[in-house]
């Protein structure tokens, strides 16, 4: 009764093809590779943004190891809480769950330690030690 009008708008916008189009994995990887070529030409905050964007593109393309690599570089260059930090926690948890399902104790411990180090980083940032 109250939400009838909103439902009509949703269905009409979807029928018109106005819903956001997701890039396919190849396009995401291509965009990430193009950005990788620009990393050396940027510095400071712009470099961090590029590294985070590359990590994000790889994450969307389900290239978890590559996403982790670029987010870790971003965190090592700019020790602050933000997108790289939150995405790394998600990625480490994905890898930890994969290790659990494969019954790989070493990998599981590795990613638990990685998560612990991120937790320590967050404590250090909050306390102003970094």
Feature-to-residue mapping (PLM):
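Conserved structural position within tetratricopeptide repeats
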Residues: 37-41, 75-76, 110, 117-120, ...
